[in-house]
Amino acid sequence: MKSPLSGQWSVIGGRFGLRLLLLVGVLWGSFNGPVALNAQQNKPWEKIPVPKLHDFKPQEPKRIELKNGIVIFLQEDHELPFVSGGVLIPGGSRDEDPAKAGLVGLYGQAWRTSGTAKMDGDQLDDLLESKAAHIETAGDDDSTAVAWDSLKGDADQVFALALDLLLHPKFNPEKLQLAQQQEAAGIVRRNDEESGIADRESAKLVYGANSPYTRQPELASIGSVTVEDLKAWHDRTIGGKLIIGITGDFDPVAMEAKLREAFESLPQAKPEPPRHDSFVGPKPGLSFINKDDVNQSNVQIMGLGIDRRNPDVPTLAVMNEILGGGFASRLFQKVRTELGLAYEVGGGFSFAYDHPGVFRVIALTKSASTVEATKAAMAEIAGLNSRPFTQEELDRAKDNILTSFLFRYDTREKVLAERERLEFYGYPPNYLETYKAALEKVTVADLTAVAKKYVHPDKLAVLVVGNGPEIKPGLDELNLGTPHSIDITIPMPKGSGGPAGAMEKMQ
């Protein structure tokens, strides 16, 4: 039924609505203005006590160690009828022969696509697709891995397929060639984006161009990899050093028995020799990479960091948040919000598990503001030693970190992955709990002390990737000496005649 007032309100809305709203607003302000202003000034909601976060007690997976040194983690989760698993295998690209840089990446691809003696990769694809299941392999700088997932009803069959791939791969020359072609395509395009260039070359400035952590595949090195190389790598790494994690809807007793049967017969792992990598940090100064097809710059300010075992890591994590961790950080507030010099700015210390991480501040800015943005970012870094930290900054940073910390481990699968990583690097199982407790205890005095200890602006290197004709003439204003130009030309194999010829030779 139509309301008897609907016609009147339509007239008011059409002809007098705006004046009526304005009149109501004026009257409301005259009657309520002092009250509203007083409420704004008092801000009573700020006095509402914020409850303390609950104690952090993640669901612990069951740890089982076999006689041959293989470690198994079982994490039950019966919410959904799925089972997923993975095998983490020590040994990655940092351990490969420099002359065959890229071997581990090729291995990670060809391993899965080649399949096994019982079932080739294409047949495996078809079977898994019919069951909405997955099996994947991959290579990283410190490890390789096999991972799988499936519905609970298919879990036994998919596990058997993954186990066969782990223990009895059949590396196919055609699949290796396909992986080489894909890798080669990535190599010839690696200078397309300034962000990729800046990240890659800044790491070289910190660790060194010949470091195992910055070594990059070239067309010649990936072209030299053979099927025999893949087999040799597999034989070298598969053994009693494995870390296995299973999560999902399974019976733990039956799962443990199945894993023991599958892995207890593998040989005892040989002790790995300790690593003796050298980390000296960057040479202070300014480096430049020309990319004249852009109108913006990627500025990176870098130094050598520390590893996670350092007891100062919790305090540095808080300092990171204050310096460049978000919208309220010093870098964001000054360089972007106040000065309007960058589209994006942030950074701080990163912490690797078994070697020093990198201190890195990144600013993305237009060409015309490159110098001013760099100066502003460097001033905020120096300010860590000259501008006192406040209790407000400390409280906000700790709250942000502790809240995000909980979300990082809010599922059993995430906790399992972290437990595996801690096991891989020999960290204590209660590392997460002690780390959180240390974060809660950080004080303003602690921040001042770590800034003095680790922040040394005179030891930092600066890399600018951008349009040379537009920005290079002004770089002298940074007072960092003569810019060192970095050559990022992609080396071509002898006799290849260029990228197209090099790609053709891999077909």
Each language-model region and where it sits:
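Charge-rich, well-structured scaffold segments of protease-associated domains
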Residues: 40-44, 65, 123-271, 315, ...
